[in-house]
Amino acid sequence: MSSSDIFIGETIGTALLILLGGGVCAAVTLKASKARNAGWLAIAFGWGFAVMTAAYISGPLSGAHLNPAVTVGIAIKDGDWSNTPTYFAGQLLGAMIGAVLVWVAYYGQFQAHLTDREIVGGPGAQDTTAKSVEAQEKGAGPVLGVFSTGPEIRHTVQNLATEIIGTFVLLLAILTQGLNDEGNGLGILGALITGFVVVSIGLSLGGPTGYAINPVRDLGPRIVHALLPLPNKGGSDWSYAWIPVVGPLIGGAIAGGVYNVAFA
């Protein structure tokens, strides 16, 4: 596949991934959303179906990595890093585009949520929970969770380890499936399996950090959150932002090495 196919495929696929995955986060979080408070099960399945859809659509163009950790794991497995920068560029651009599309689709809900005194504070606001106060002190705005991940308990080693472990599981599941005969991605069955692996990771390992398991899934939307003209949006929590980038890259690299030792 050509560099242009890779870039276009990763941009489109990652944009779809963030549109559908970030969209479910918006749906369950924002005021005036019909799905508000649908819960963690909706988020886990929403992200799984997002991965499934994006992988199926973009697979013929780029192989549907959609995740720098996947690109790193496959590069280690194959010993070929030549297209890595192209994959990374398409993935980051796509993630940012997807986050902007979520904002467009939920524009009214964002405005309603961020101008609600009970949510953002101010005169007449009710007392916020201790968790909300702690989040604000750490620089996390009231809608940052729609865009990116954040830990329930801030513990650098634990948070990093959780992202490494979750991404390792994802990559091992992907690498052991292998590419289909045409080399154009996981195919229909592979996309389905990978989607349900993501659901499983979300349900079992998502509690501590929100399971980024993908550097651009967190970084791209976090950049968009910082840039968008959202009222009362608060901080983008840059002090935490390195963990959902570095952790998945380490997990992907370990999975690539383990695959070569145990499965190749």
UniProtKB/Swiss-Prot annotation:
GO molecular function list: glycerol channel activity
Biological processes per GO annotation: glycerol transmembrane transport
Keywords: Cell membrane, Membrane, Repeat, Transmembrane, Transmembrane helix, Transport
Motif NPA 1 in this chain: 67-69
Subcellular location: Cell membrane
Domain of life of the organism encoding this protein: Bacteria
Induction conditions: By glycerol.
A Pfam short name: MIP
UniProt xrefs under SUPFAM superfamilies: Aquaporin-like
Motif NPA 2: chain residues: 214-216
Membrane-traversing stretches: 6-26, 38-58, 88-108, 159-179, 185-205, 243-263
Record's keyword annotation contains Repeat: yes
Reactions listed under catalytic activity: glycerol(in) = glycerol(out)
Keyword NADP: no
CC terms in the record's Gene Ontology section: plasma membrane
Entry membrane topology: Multi-pass membrane protein
Domain notes per entry: Aquaporins contain two tandem repeats each containing three membrane-spanning domains and a pore-forming loop with the signature motif Asn-Pro-Ala/Val (NPA).
NCBIfam families: MIP
Family classification: Belongs to the MIP/aquaporin (TC 1.A.8) family.
Function: Mediates glycerol diffusion across the cytoplasmic membrane via a pore-type mechanism.
PANTHER family linked: AQUAPORIN OR AQUAGLYCEROPORIN RELATED, AQUAPORIN-9
Protein name per its UniProtKB record: Probable glycerol uptake facilitator protein
Species per Swiss-Prot/TrEMBL record: Streptomyces coelicolor (strain ATCC BAA-471 / A3(2) / M145)
